[in-house]
């Protein structure tokens, strides 16, 4: 199976299945001398891990990460950083009834046709369990980017039909939804409680923002920064759409509205989401991602078995009724991996570039 590595200079390779003994990652290209300890990684892993509220899967995984290499006396050495998280709460028997069935809207059918063999336990390699390693690797990238003045944060901006206006970052870490509006939390909780009673699932929208990014990151033509961000975010399980800045709303905008006019005091708007011509402008980089409802629900769904016979599928086991609830740290991680990769690429070619034009902020 190819396609397990992301990045060019800062690279992340992951391996492991949902019900295998462990998940692993190799992170290569991290600059030496970065102070790094387990807590730097564990902090974000704890934000993503399952079983932290009644609104997520009740699978109990500590997601305790081990650093196997690349860190000595509390600092990165420049060597590959090996990471490991052991799986401890697998219940594979929950999936024995569907081992020869294809869950509708899941990767079962496509994996079967592509490889001719698949690990049906918890979705195997296609499970979102894999994203734990992305979060661990992304935490390394976030730590280095923070040393360069770049801060990456995310929040839930919609759950099902409920739009969530941004009010304050202070609220995001105080609830299970990463919700930036504390007044919306009771409505979200009530909606999720009813969803469980309905034995159904729902989608969500996540917004992720990078502040402090300098102008110049991005490699036209084919490695535009927004193209690579879209690639990274679309690679997250259940993501079916990505927008940068105004995204699809720009269709209804006129040029006089959409263009981000500049004054000596700064940009007057940020419809471009901080990226112009595939290169960062120095404004906040803003991306939105849409996650579909999970297909692993207990309401029967029509499908087929491996022989093509009609079948009704009921997925037992422990699943997230809304995968978007735990997606914010994953989106942050993928944005961080992209930005650090492009920061290192920019240094390699353009470290000596200097212009007299001031760097504009946001008015």
UniProtKB/Swiss-Prot annotation:
Subunit-structure text: Homotetramer.
SUPFAM superfamilies: Chorismate synthase, AroC (SSF103263)
Residues that hold FMN according to the record: 125-127, 237-238, 277, 292-296, 318
A GO biological-process term: chorismate biosynthetic process
Cofactor stoichiometry and binding remark: Reduced FMN (FMNH(2)).
Reaction equation(s) it catalyzes: 5-O-(1-carboxyvinyl)-3-phosphoshikimate = chorismate + phosphate
Names of required cofactors: FMNH2
Entry EC no(s): 4.2.3.5
Molecular function GO labels: chorismate synthase activity; FMN binding
Top-level taxonomic group: Bacteria
Disulfide bonds: none
Coiled coil: none
The family this protein is said to belong to: Belongs to the chorismate synthase family.
Annotated keywords: Amino-acid biosynthesis, Aromatic amino acid biosynthesis, FAD, Flavoprotein, FMN, Lyase, NADP
Pfam families associated with the record: Chorismate_synt (PF01264)
Name of protein: Chorismate synthase
PROSITE patterns in UniProt: CHORISMATE_SYNTHASE_1, CHORISMATE_SYNTHASE_2, CHORISMATE_SYNTHASE_3
Entry keyword annotation includes Acetylation: no
Pathway(s) of this molecule: Metabolic intermediate biosynthesis; chorismate biosynthesis; chorismate from D-erythrose 4-phosphate and phosphoenolpyruvate: step 7/7
Native source organism of the sequence: Pseudomonas syringae pv. syringae (strain B728a)
Class of the enzyme per the UniProt entry, highest EC level: lyase
GO CC, alphabetical: cytosol
Function: This reaction introduces a second double bond into the aromatic ring system.
Binding site for NADP(+): 48, 54
